[in-house]
């Protein structure tokens, strides 16, 4: 929070506050969708709390000289768990592991009616699919209703995070060339990874080649 760019590199951890001049083009599509300016620097505002669940953010590091500003944000769901000489470390009680499924999808036409500031909340409820993807995968999920789309309170967000967490992968390991994940699903479904989509990715499920889909305007 309001700290150095690329702090995650110092700690060998992934981080959503990041400066990098070589990024996957799809991230330039995704971030404006959810109300975040993106060029070579990503720095989502703390007020966009639902993005933290969607992007599997577990901790926020707050410089000690910025604690007063952090407290003024009055953000729910963050608990102080540790500290260093320079930082206070807060844990996200609504953290969702990297890689999870949905019970619902939302079409591009329906998603266009959602404001940028509420987009993160809606994307915790439903997977954004193109019309072609709805034809291919729509039978796996329900079409999000307008009533469900409009339920975007913090309490709704907590419930959505809980639901996504219950369907999350059991392990996720980043590698030099990509990542591996394990999941135990009751039925066939799409698994969202908040990784920028790129044509160079390939995937296998139980050793069988699988399609990698671009969803949520830039994730996969």
Segments (PLM) and residue ranges:
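Solvent-exposed loop/turn segments at secondary-structure junctions
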Residues: 2-5, 60, 66-68, 96-97, ...
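Periplasmic/luminal catalytic loop of GT-C fold multi-pass membrane glycosyltransferases
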Residues: 38-82
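Conserved beta strand-loop-helix elements of the APE1-like EEP
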Residues: 88-95
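Short beta-strand-to-loop capping motifs
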Residues: 62-64, 92, 183-185
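Extracytoplasmic/lumenal acceptor-recognition loop(s) of multi-pass membrane glycoenzymes
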Residues: 1-55, 95-161, 198, 209
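Active-site-proximal, structured, solvent-exposed surfaces of multi-pass membrane proteins
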Residues: 141-220
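Active-site regions of enzymes building and remodeling cell-envelope glycoconjugates
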Residues: 9-16, 72-83, 87
